[in-house]
Amino acid sequence: MPQHELRTRQLRGLAHRLGLEFQAEDTYDLPAQLADFRLFRKGSRHRASNIMRKQDELISFDARIFDYRYVKWAGNHVKRYQQTVFFLQSTQLGLPELWLRPETIMHKIGELFGRRDIDFVRFPKFSGQYRLTGEDEIFIRHHFTDEVLNYFTIEKGWSLEGIGYYLILYKKNRLFSPRDIEYFYKKGIEVFRMLADK
């Protein structure tokens, strides 16, 4: 059995065990629906698959985990990216537009040329590990409570984007194995609960 078919089969079984809906193929063109997020504007040939979904009865909570692939061209060469994405829509969220990602040496060099991010004096480890950007700094600081900052200080390597009632969480170019999907789902729910309006 080809590897992608085996993955689909394993994820279908996992979704059933967790009480999640499962759809092997994306019939709704998720990447186009999520194009407000930066991740889904990168590259070309965007494709979502193996979509697992959980909704509450009032549809005030809609969470999905899916495989996402796209390609980027560099001259005559193509680089393929794939990652597992957690997407959540909820009226309990009211997020400013924000982008959190691991900070690299290129980001630090960029700061020398005025490309600043949002740092937290009381959480230097967080500020050293992550680059947090967005237009409304005051509103972003309101949502990044001590609980959130502590969480991401311990949890390294995540990328998070938020816009209004929507958020996505992923690790760049990391396709979670079927045995790690439940862990990833729980991480997504934890982040949602921390960022939700109290």
PLM regions: where:
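Charged, low-complexity intrinsically disordered regions
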Residues: 8-198
